Amino acid sequence: MAKNFKLPVQIIDFIRTHHGTTVAYFFFKKYTDLNPWDTTKENEFTYPGPKPFSKETAVVMMADAVEAASRSLLKYSEESISELVERIVYLQEQDGQFSDIPLTFKDISDIKSSFKKRLSNIYHVRIAYPERDY
């Protein structure tokens, strides 16, 4: 569809790689809960890829996953946001999604710090201001 609309190749790259070869875990978990005897279908719930192949496509993958997961937080605090970002990026790293990219530990640390700051700004809790009498 992106090619039909003549989107730039860089945008198409982001579209193709933003899920990499990850498992659509929510749907896979639902399936295995309903079919506990069938553990052979994980590949049917796995995105075809490719994995991110540039720092930029890796950042988009991380941002997409972190933003989506942040919507399911029950409580927004610095701690819950930090734990979420750490967990999501750790799982992507462990899954080998960044194996084709020269990301350094510093790169990943800087990216996670940026996400934590941005999400904290988005979800910050304001104090309730008292009503003014006019």
Identify the role of each PLM range.
Residues M1-Y134:
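Terminal helices and disordered tails flanking the catalytic cores of nucleotide-processing hydrolases
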